[in-house]
Curated annotation (Swiss-Prot):
Organism field: Escherichia coli O6:H1 (strain CFT073 / ATCC 700928 / UPEC)
Positions annotated to bind substrate: 248-250
Gene3D superfamilies for this protein: Crotonobetainyl-coa:carnitine coa-transferase, domain 1 (3.40.50.10540), formyl-coa transferase, domain 3 (3.30.1540.10)
Active site location: 169 (nucleophile)
Pathway: Metabolic intermediate degradation; oxalate degradation; CO(2) and formate from oxalate: step 1/2
Chain residues that bind CoA: 17-18, 38, 72-75, 96-98, 104, 137-140, 273-275
An annotated GO BP: oxalate catabolic process
Catalytic activity entry: formyl-CoA + oxalate = oxalyl-CoA + formate
GO terms, molecular function: formyl-CoA transferase activity
Residue ranges crossing the lipid bilayer per the database entry: none
Name the UniProt record assigns to this protein: Formyl-CoA:oxalate CoA-transferase
Quaternary assembly: Homodimer.
Purpose: Involved in the catabolism of oxalate and in the adapatation to low pH via the induction of the oxalate-dependent acid tolerance response (ATR). Catalyzes the transfer of the CoA moiety from formyl-CoA to oxalate.
Length: 416
């Protein structure tokens, strides 16, 4: 089966999550992704949060499927020679080292262009070069804090909160992926590669654009009507935290369902749509609200919004969350059960769609991983296991023209 990136070679000089999430997607699209790792050590996530002693951790295996792994010591002359040959044949190189790290290896962008002017160089950093935080080490939650997500997440009477979703890491990888694919198309027109940089702060900010929208509205109005603080609370000079409110002009909230006392996920998310208010009133047994001036418009409802959700919860708390969603869907009400990761891992529909995939690695055995979120009509990504450390070192070196004796010598010299 033909794949979109068949024939594209990618050098994966990344670790942890932001870079590997990008290169894994390239591999799913058919690129030959060669993960370059330190001899005997490898990506740090191979060893982090292990559930089986001395076996690659799920942290690694779920971010590096479909790749090949080589061990290469770029501090040695032989290692640098191999790296230069790899660059000469590659289409894309991706790195997410601390600023300046790859330059210190001797592979500046200028030098890379001399070796291979068609190469696309993807780079992930915590902050843009013009940021005062450019030299700050960035991880997931650092990016969420600096990108506007933490300050706008949580409840108004509590501290900023970070999201469990990887807004700083995997989200940055997906943003870089888009840039790399655009650069590939641009190369078709110009014949030349280019550098594509992605900061984690920018990636988080791109998902917080509605909060930047709200900041400008707040500056002009002094209040934000769709936030729970309106009309009885107070607004400061920055966008506040809104709890579980919808934030998009459609009020929403998390509501309890039957069993909430013992099940931490016995909840649904319920959204009130202006155009569907009549159906909402019918669904919750409050038809009188349809014509009541105190409830008939979104503006009129906002002062009573918590009373409205409390009334809806009187119904939802009596039934199972799945029953609640099934019932409310009949009235075209946007809602969903709060699904635990246990429920997601066992959901047969997610297995059928390929969103959750079971793969097998030689030492670990079978494990679940997240599959490709995009569904294509012309091809289906074949999700394979992550590589063992250095599993493909010899094969890749042979492809570069090295003999068995030369490979053995490099091993002896600790270059591989």
């Amino acid at each position: 089966m033909s794949t979109p990136l068949q024939g594209i070679k990618v050098l994966d000089f990344t670790g942890v999550q932001s870079g590997p999430s990008c290169t894994q997607m390239l591999a799913w699209f058919g690129a030959d992704v060669i993960k370059i790792e330190r001899p005997s050590v490898g990506d740090v996530t191979r060893h982090q949060l292990r559930d089986i002693p001395d076996i690659d951790a799920l942290y690694f295996t779920m971010l590096n499927s479909n790749k090949r792994s080589i061990e290469l010591n770029t501090k040695t002359a032989e290692g640098k020679e191999v790296m230069e040959k790899l660059i000469r044949e590659a289409d894309i190189l991706v790195e997410n080292f601390h600023p300046g790290a790859i330059d210190h290896m001797g592979f500046t962008w200028e030098h890379i262009q001399e070796i291979n002017p068609r190469l696309i160089f993807g780079s992930i950093k915590g902050f843009d070069e013009c940021s005062p935080y450019v030299n700050v080490k960035a991880y997931e939650n650092v990016a969420q804090a600096a990108g506007g997500a933490a300050s706008t997440t949580g409840f108004w009477d509590g501290p900023p909160l970070v999201s469990a979703a990887a807004l700083g890491d995997s989200n940055t990888g997906m943003h870089l992926l888009i840039g790399l694919l655009a650069a590939l198309l641009h190369r078709e027109k110009t014949g030349r590669g280019q550098r594509v940089t992605m900061s984690m702060q920018d990636a988080v900010l791109n998902l917080c654009r509605v909060k930047l929208r709200d900041q400008q509205r707040l500056d002009k109005l002094g209040y934000l009507e769709e936030y729970p603080q309106y009309p009885n609370g107070t607004f400061g000079d920055a966008v506040p935290r809104g709890g579980n409110a919808g934030g998009g002009g459609q009020p929403g909230w998390i509501l309890k369902c039957k069993g909430w006392e013992t099940d931490p996920n016995a909840y649904i998310y319920f959204t009130i749509q202006e155009q569907n208010w009549e159906n909402t009133c019918k669904a919750i047994g409050k038809p009188e609200w349809i014509t009541d001036p105190a409830y008939s418009t979104a503006h009129a409802r906002q002062p009573h919004i918590f009373d409205i959700f409390a009334e809806i919860e009187k119904y939802t708390v009596t039934i199972d969350k799945h029953e609640a969603v099934a019932y409310l869907t009949q009235f075209d009400i946007p809602c969903a059960p709060v699904l635990s990761m246990k429920e997601i891992s066992l959901d047969p529909s997610l297995r059928q769609s390929g969103s959750v995939v079971e793969v097998e690695q030689p030492l670990r055995g079978k494990y679940l991983t997240v599959g490709c979120p995009m569904k294509f009509s012309a091809f289906t990504p074949d999700i394979k296991a992550a590589p063992l450390l250095g599993e493909h070192t010899a094969a890749v070196l042979q492809e570069l023209g090295y003999s068995d004796d030369e490979i053995a010598a490099m091993k002896q010299n600790h270059a591989i």
